[in-house]
Every structure is written in structure tokens, then in C-alpha cells.
């Protein structure tokens, strides 16, 4: 995708209704799309790094479905997880995406195997994780690249392991960095209630 092209996702963002709030050092932005679905994002007010992204679709009967966490830690209370049958063993691998300004990054906790156990590859527009002992398999979807119609490049994929956590990183293409910079410029122009805007110029 060239920087001059406009993707369907960019058009969707442009046409969405949005509100912004500066609170507790975070810039909170809420989008409502034409199909009734929603997206909620939170950014660090100083660094402008994305801290959280959640999405929610509208049900066929018009009711709102549960929020799906795309970036950040899930904040579903443990009691609620038990009630809706989502509670898993505390020893099961847990995936969370924690991005940086120049990387997409995933942390997969409760993976005790040494680093030479893991094999990562790019398959069908996903990052695929396998272990040589065949005890773990996972596909990671890079939604930001899909929305901007960009391909994954195996050369930009790295990983490390420490404290029973596998850390998978993918360097953001320049097209993504430019998109995020332009988006933040627009978000800073939204009328926000709350704290004084401290976001650094990108």
C-alpha cells in the first residue's frame, strides 16, 4: 500500500462518530461506526503510545456484544470470568498485546520452555508460534497491518524469552508509523474534556 492510497479502514475511521476524553494521564477515544459497532482506545497522554484497544460489535437483535480486547490487558474481573465460563487454569498460557511506538509486541505468559524450543513463522497473514515439543501452538493476528492492507515481512519478526514469558515483536512498517502519526494529529484536534493535553509532538 502506498502512502497516497486510502484504505477502507481509513475511510471507516473518517466517517465514524468519535468522542475524546483526557483523564488520569490518558487520552481516551471512543468510536461509533455506521454499522453500530464500537472501538475504544486509550493512549498515554505524554508518549502517545497506544495502551488499550477494545472492540464491540452490535448483535443481530440490536444488543451490544461483549468487548473484545485487541491491545492491552483484559480487565474482566475473575468473578465475572467464572460466571460466564471463561475462567482458565492459572498455569495456561495467557496472550496480551502491549505495543511500543515502533513495534507491535505480544507477551505470552506461562510458557516455561527454553528459547530454542520455539519456532516462529509467517503463514496466511499470521504470526505462527510452534514448539518443538508440540505443547504449544498459536496464531497471532496483526490486525493493524490487515486494516492498512500491508503484508507481513518475516525479516521484521523477533522474539525473546524471560521469566516464563515469550515476547514476540514485529517492527512497524513506515506506512504504519505515518498512519499513526497522522491519526494522533487528528485525535489531538478533537475537543477533549478533562486534563491538560500533555501529548508530545510525534
Tell me the role of every PLM-derived stretch.
Residues 1-106, 171-202:
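N-terminal low-complexity tails
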Residues 95-178:
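Charged, surface-exposed interaction regions in soluble eukaryotic proteins
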